[in-house]
């Protein structure tokens, strides 16, 4: 893995263009779009969690797995692509943060996101506020993002911004297949700019050092 961007001060932030998952973004986006057939937010931010089944629908969340029409909508091949992308990123976090092989585990919530310029209907649509991941999700130790669409050509706005203590923001422009990874604590305050046009797709893949908070990979539900 060759870092496309790297900055080290009180924290480490890394952005990669990961060639080994270059062919997977379209497959992963297809997985998400299948889920969106069964619901999406009435505001600007929709999510799908393949592990818990959480899906945005209107101004609330539903469990997609309780809908009999969703039985077997994702094939073993699709889920294998998702798991492979997750594992590639997990190993990249291990390598670049100097961790032991089994030091981190996938944790909840890990989810697809879709952001548009629709006005917010609930607080869950207001993704643009500066925040710290570990304050929002206590189980997070490392956060990674895999982008599934291109800034500039498929959407405007929606860049990822680190708010650093030296009063200088550092901005990541999403590109399909690009991966960013960072520690989830207060050293990495950040926000996402409002999407002003088009649709921004990504996956948040979260890792914990506490095996008690590990979650299993998704599987075909019969």
Q: Across the structure, where does each feature detected by a protein language model lie?
A:
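Fe(II)/2-oxoglutarate oxygenase catalytic core
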Residues: 1-182, 186-222
């Amino acid at each position: 893995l060759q870092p496309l961007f790297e900055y080290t001060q009180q924290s480490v932030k890394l952005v990669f263009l990961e060639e080994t998952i270059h062919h997977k973004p379209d497959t992963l986006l297809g997985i998400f779009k299948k889920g969106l057939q069964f619901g999406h937010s009435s505001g600007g931010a929709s999510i799908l969690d393949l592990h818990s089944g959480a899906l945005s629908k209107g101004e609330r969340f539903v469990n997609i797995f309780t809908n009999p029409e969703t039985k077997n909508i994702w094939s073993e091949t699709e889920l294998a692509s998702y798991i492979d992308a997750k594992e590639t990123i997990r190993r990249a976090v291990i390598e670049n943060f100097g961790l032991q092989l089994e030091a981190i585990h996938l944790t909840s919530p890990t989810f697809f996101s879709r952001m548009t310029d629709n006005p917010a209907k609930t607080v869950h649509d207001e993704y643009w506020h500066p925040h710290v991941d570990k304050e929002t999700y206590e189980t997070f130790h490392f956060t990674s993002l895999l982008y599934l669409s291109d800034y500039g050509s498929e959407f405007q706005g929606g860049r990822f911004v680190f708010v650093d203590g030296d009063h200088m923001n550092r901005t990541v422009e999403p590109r399909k297949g690009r991966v960013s990874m960072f520690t989830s604590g207060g050293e990495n305050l950040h926000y996402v700019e409002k999407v002003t046009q088009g649709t921004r797709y990504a996956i948040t893949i979260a890792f914990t050092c506490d095996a008690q908070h590990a979650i299993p990979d998704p599987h075909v539900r019969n």
